[in-house]
């Protein structure tokens, strides 16, 4: 059992380089090291977790963002299209080459400590309310809006466009 380990890719796995590496408490360090080397050797980026957690890291981060996105729809703050643009034309562009911690570290002259000092209470106040059932938001018209924007009968076209854009972004990132 010392060789048991989880290697969790992110969709679409043929393009996204990140692969979460999740050793069990009984997994040997040698196994973890070998798996990371194999993952790296095929052009992927291993993300080593210190311990297993439901959803691992990528799904949990995505889930946190989606929880607030569903809440914004529920509260009538903006449309799904505006939320998608907030990511694709805002956070996503920046986060594609620098993660959230690097971003906030650079957003305050004093780095992350200054950022936390300035904004911690504001962010804590923003998220006291997050107790939302995502399915209740679907009933408020979210699904209809998304189906108008992204007709699932054209899913293959959207996936091809996504893959082309990701490929270009990845190629761009490797050049700099």
Where are these regions (language model features)?
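Rossmann-fold dinucleotide-binding core
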Residues: 1-51, 55, 59
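Charged, alpha-helix-enriched surfaces in structured cytosolic catalytic cores
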Residues: 2, 26, 30, 64, ...
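Residue-level signal for short amphipathic helical patches enriched in basic/charged
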Residues: 13, 64, 107
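NAD(P)-dependent Rossmann-like dehydrogenase/reductase catalytic/cofactor-binding core
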Residues: 33, 44, 74-176
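Residues within well-ordered alpha helices
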Residues: 38, 71-72
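Short, flexible helix-loop junctions that flank or precede catalytic/ligand sites
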Residues: 52, 71, 89
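Structural/interface elements that position substrates and couple domains in central-metabolism enzymes
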Residues: 58, 62-68
């Amino acid at each position: 059992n010392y060789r048991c380990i989880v290697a969790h890719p992110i969709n679409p796995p043929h393009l996204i380089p990140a692969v979460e590496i999740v050793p069990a408490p009984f997994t040997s360090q040698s196994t973890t090291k070998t798996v990371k080397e194999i993952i790296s050797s095929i052009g992927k980026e291993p993300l080593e977790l210190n311990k297993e957690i439901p959803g691992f890291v990528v799904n949990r981060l995505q889930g946190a963002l989606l929880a607030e996105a569903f809440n914004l729809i529920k509260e009538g703050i903006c449309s799904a299209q505006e939320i998608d643009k907030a990511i694709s034309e805002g956070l996503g562009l920046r986060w594609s080459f620098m993660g959230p911690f690097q971003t906030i570290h650079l957003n305050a002259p004093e780095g992350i400590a200054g950022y936390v000092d300035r904004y911690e209470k504001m962010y804590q106040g923003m998220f006291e309310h997050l107790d939302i059932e995502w399915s209740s938001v679907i009933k408020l018209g979210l699904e209809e809006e998304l189906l108008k924007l992204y007709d699932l009968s054209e899913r293959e076209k959207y996936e091809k466009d996504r893959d082309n854009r990701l490929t270009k972004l990845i190629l761009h990132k490797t050049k700099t």
